[in-house]
Amino acid sequence: LPPKTWFTRVDESPDELFYSSPRFAEHIDKATISNLSDFYKETIREDSEVLDLMSSWISHLPNDLMLSRVSGLGMNDDELSANDKLTDWCIHNLNNEPELPYKANSFNYVLCAVSIQYLTSPIEVFQSVKAVLKDQGQVIIAMSHRLFPTKAVSVFQNINREDRVRLVMSYLELSGFEEISFFDRSPKDADPLWIVTGQNNRI
């Protein structure tokens, strides 16, 4: 397992304080958002049940993708209530409580967009993600190069792009996921987009 020192942060004050004020900003370029939406369109089946982990006011899901449920888990009620893709949401600090507040076998897909760098207990979180996913369910982790430097874990700030991807793939492997894959969907002259996926094969 990765050493705990990898997951220390400059600002170890309660995350609730940092996220208390809503941030209605796009954290990646529009071209990068478009590529992420296209990937979701290609990957997520219609009528699926989806969990948007570490969610905010925008989920990057395409408008023409019809889903039966989109649950959001995040840190700011104003942001989550402004997200018109969500059918339900909850406030939950994964760094304090890595276990997700959902029943087992609840979702076909779990998404985590440009937030993986803030998890201080990623293995525990993704073990819980695996539990709430249905058999053959997928986790989709989208990454770029931007971050809040005071809240991102130290390991993410001290390794290069290739090692960040390898690190996230190791999170999924250590959590029991299979068929772990990497996709580079970076647009030209915009923020990069690196996507890691894993599948929950129970049977």
Language-model segments: residues:
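A short glycine-rich, Lys/Arg-flanked "PGG" loop and its adjoining helix->strand segment in the class I
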Residues: 123-138
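Conserved class I S-adenosyl-L-methionine
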Residues: 138-169
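A short SAM/SAH-binding and catalytic strip from SAM-dependent methyltransferases
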Residues: 108-123
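Short alpha-helix
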Residues: 35, 159-182
